[in-house]
Amino acid sequence: MPQRLQILYNTVIVPKLQKELGYTNIHQVPRLEKIVINRGLGDASQNAKALESSIAEISAITGQRPVITRAKKAIASFKIRKGMPVGLMVTLRRERMYAFLDRLINIALPRIRDFRGVSPKSFDGRGNYTLGIREQLIFPEINYDSVDQIRGMDISIVTTAETDEEGRALLKEFGMPFAS
């Protein structure tokens, strides 16, 4: 079933951006490709409980089980051996991606303390946007009592936009609250 933002994109955003950016073909209009949620877990190698609770939290937030990222090589000063778990990652596409973006923009971001909008400078030069979240409690799926430690995550929104201006225009149409 198509998500609310997906319907909005197809009916309102595409024609508006096509006119705004001067495209002749609707396939030239930038679109969302995927959303990648990443969480680094420094203590996961020593603390298996932290890994399990993080898997449960990210599964609840995204509706998809995360993949465990492992160390590529040993780093003695961090007490990490090759193959040890160092983080979690989820790649969302299609309906789940639009559902997550909808919840992020309309529910989670406004719940951040002293929220004045997300930084418009976090584009990578190719139209992709990344934001860091300091605590997982902003998501309504997380039960406050079940959280053992406050952990953040990185959210990367990958678009087909070729410039930052196109990416910003696309996310602004979706309702992303950029700080002025």
UniProtKB/Swiss-Prot annotation:
GO MF, one annotated term: rRNA binding
Any single GO CC term annotated in Swiss-Prot or TrEMBL for this entry: ribosome
Statement: the UniProt record of this protein carries the keyword Membrane: no
Gene3D superfamilies (UniProt xref): 3.30.1440.10
GO biological process: translation
Pfam families reported for this sequence: Ribosomal_L5 (PF00281), Ribosomal_L5_C (PF00673)
Keywords recorded for this protein, A-Z: Ribonucleoprotein, Ribosomal protein, RNA-binding, rRNA-binding, tRNA-binding
Lineage top rank: taxon: Bacteria
UniProt-listed InterPro entries: Ribosomal_uL5 (IPR002132), Ribosomal_uL5_bac-type (IPR020930), Ribosomal_uL5_C (IPR031309), Ribosomal_uL5_CS (IPR020929), Ribosomal_uL5_dom_sf (IPR022803), Ribosomal_uL5_N (IPR031310)
Subunit structure of this chain's protein: Part of the 50S ribosomal subunit; part of the 5S rRNA/L5/L18/L25 subcomplex. Contacts the 5S rRNA and the P site tRNA. Forms a bridge to the 30S subunit in the 70S ribosome.
PANTHER family on file: 60S RIBOSOMAL PROTEIN L11-RELATED
Function: This is one of the proteins that bind and probably mediate the attachment of the 5S RNA into the large ribosomal subunit, where it forms part of the central protuberance. In the 70S ribosome it contacts protein S13 of the 30S subunit (bridge B1b), connecting the 2 subunits; this bridge is implicated in subunit movement. Contacts the P site tRNA; the 5S rRNA and some of its associated proteins might help stabilize positioning of ribosome-bound tRNAs.
Family under the similarity heading: Belongs to the universal ribosomal protein uL5 family.
Protein name, per record: Large ribosomal subunit protein uL5
Source species: Synechococcus sp. (strain JA-3-3Ab)
Gene: rplE
